[in-house]
Amino acid sequence: MCTPDENDYKTSTDPDTSANTNHTLEKKKRKKRKNTNVACVNCSRLHVSCEAKRPCLRCISKGLTATCVDAPRKKSKYLAGIPNRELPMNIQPDLPPRKIMIPIYNNSSNSSLNVNNMGEQQKFTSPQHIVHKAKFLSNAADSEYSILSNIIYQDTLSNKIPIDILYSNTNSTSNSTIGNSSNNSPTGTNTSPEETEMEKIRQLYSEQRANIPPHPYPSSNQNVYSILLGPNSAKIVASQVNLFANHFPLVPVDSADNSLSFKRLLPRDPSEKSSQINWDSSINQYYLNSETVTFPELAIPLKRRKNHLVSVSLESCSPDAANIKSNVEWEHSLRYSTPMEIYTSINAPFSHTPGFHHLLVYLKHRFNQQDLVKMCRSIAEFRPIFIACSVTLTEEDMIFMEQCYQRTLLEYVKFIAQIGTPTCIWRRNGQISYVNEEFEILCGWTREELLNKMTFIVEIMDDESVRDYFKTLSKVAYRDFRGSEKMKVCRLLSPIKGKIIHCCCMWTLKRDVSGLPLMILGNFMPILN
């Protein structure tokens, strides 16, 4: 048997080997080819090639230059069922720019109006202006989620679409009224975005309350805020601005005699001085009440007797004074004193949106950026829980939640009146909803001063306590469901400037039927040593 020579292997050509070599060379050539251009809308519809520049040559020849824009890219599968207009701008598919859809006429007034509209559309279609409209079944839940998103993402409302425009029907008369007033205003071009937005919110609020009978202006009979709202207190009271819709923080006042006589209208008895401190030397005991002597006024006497055991006693009030106090005009507080009134009279949900908005504005004026970021992180933990609990809630459910709040608050008020522990109740946005008489005596702020306007619990805390407040809030409300937590630091600010009450504060969280934080009960006890 003859064997082939070695040269035969070298000179012979294998067809399979040459084919594989050619295939490898073709692959290398394919890798080096240029990326294909994104076709325009017209070329993509006809499945023909397109060039990079706009308008392309084919659209120029066909006379379709006005609509020659990049074809929108395919959306992700999890966004397939959501319309493009309801998506946040940062995840919307690439759409044709809207500026070419606005014709500019020769008329000067029309052209200026169209240019303004073009600028406004470009502003709201810019990626820097994130617009979110969650698919909640309740307008109240939509509004609250929107303000939480605004707080977390950019900490400002100046470059967002106003909530009253974003979450209202396009064919409503209120929106057209607001739009016309803003466009026809002669000073509209000179106002800042924040002022324009606040003006729209005020107009919307006035329209919403147009059908509600007028209520007495807060503190119309007693000017309790004439000196407690800072240097401009008198002007604020004289302007009769709605203190429930606009926030003005409480400001401590300098007191020469370290008493609260500067804000007491009349003493209980004409023969009794308002600054008189009742003291029983035989048992080293002070007697306090909410009308004449409160705990902050004992700062100096307690320092003098710091080496002695001192006790504090509260003067008992009459049975009539211990009745349940409700006010129909205080929407954030206890409005009715019977369950029947609660279930028959409450027909609208309570909006937490203004409270969150004003809380953020207040924190911005009080704290630096570093502290503000930490507080916003604590608030950010609330968003996923809010989505999970509220996505299926309807407007009727939100009304029922407010009825549950009022009904629960009514029962707690009865219970708190029998305990005697200084207690303050606030909503999940920090707005104070109820205080008992013992809390008035402890901090020096009266019930009318705290509830007759929009007041946040952080207003009467020092800076370190506010920082710990948001840490405690994230623990008790969002991380676990124990329902109780103790603040590490709690120091209350009294109406007397410089007088701080060191306290031990224990939180008790009450949730609604959907799991959302309904109310927070804070029990405060003074630290005497």
Curated annotation (Swiss-Prot):
GO terms for biological process: cellular response to starvation; gluconeogenesis. Residues 40-68 bind DNA. It is found in: Nucleus. Its main location: nucleus. Residues 1-31, 174-198 are annotated as: Disordered. GO terms for cellular component: nucleus. InterPro entries: ERT1_acuK_gluconeogen_tf, PAS, PAS-like_dom_sf, PAS_13, Zn2-C6_fun-type_DNA-bd_sf, Zn2Cys6_DnaBD. Residues 14-23 have a biased composition (Polar residues). Residues 174-193 have a biased composition (Low complexity). Keywords: Activator, DNA-binding, Gluconeogenesis, Metal-binding, Nucleus, Transcription, Transcription regulation, Zinc. Signal peptide: none annotated. It comes from the Eukaryota. Residues 408-480 form the PAS domain. Transcription factor which regulates nonfermentable carbon utilization. Activator of gluconeogenetic genes. Belongs to the ERT1/acuK family. This is Transcription activator of gluconeogenesis.
